[in-house]
Amino acid sequence: MKQRIVTALILAIVAVCLILLAPTSLFASVLVVVWAVAVWEWTGLIGMRAAQVRIAAVLAVVLAQAGLWSVRDSSLWWAVLVAGVIWWPLALLWMRRYTFSASPTSRNKAIKLLAGLCVLVPAWAALVQLHGETPDGRLWTLFALVLVWAADTFAYFAGSRFGRNKLAPRRSPGKNLDGVWGAL
């Protein structure tokens, strides 16, 4: 536990310095690397085991991010941001109907991969936009990420300490309502 806390503190200091001091181009580039790791993890979580498929997914996201960066002042950039906003309520409705823990068929894995990409690419664009848009963009980026980090931390500790009532046992068995209240 001590090593986990020290690692978290070091990463937090690096992240805060990156957010507050780095130009948006460097911030975006570092996020590309973080997102590549996230895609690799996501493909593993959804049951994709073939390394070449996972690498292809990572490359697809990196290329999408590079392409978006090259058109960041265009309507395509804004279309991706709007699509990301529209995606979230649709995903919530979809999760009520679709069982993500369904049989691990190729089709289900492809759907899960697409769902992850619909979250990750717009989220990257949103953070980059927030960071570079206004003179206070760096502070707003820090505020947004601290809010997420705090909610995640409080959810973890509240869920670990008090968690009895499962939130969605078939989709995410470790999540519970007490964690939700801790996050809020």
Where do the PLM segments sit?
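Membrane-embedded alpha-helical bundles of polytopic integral membrane proteins
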Residues: 1-184
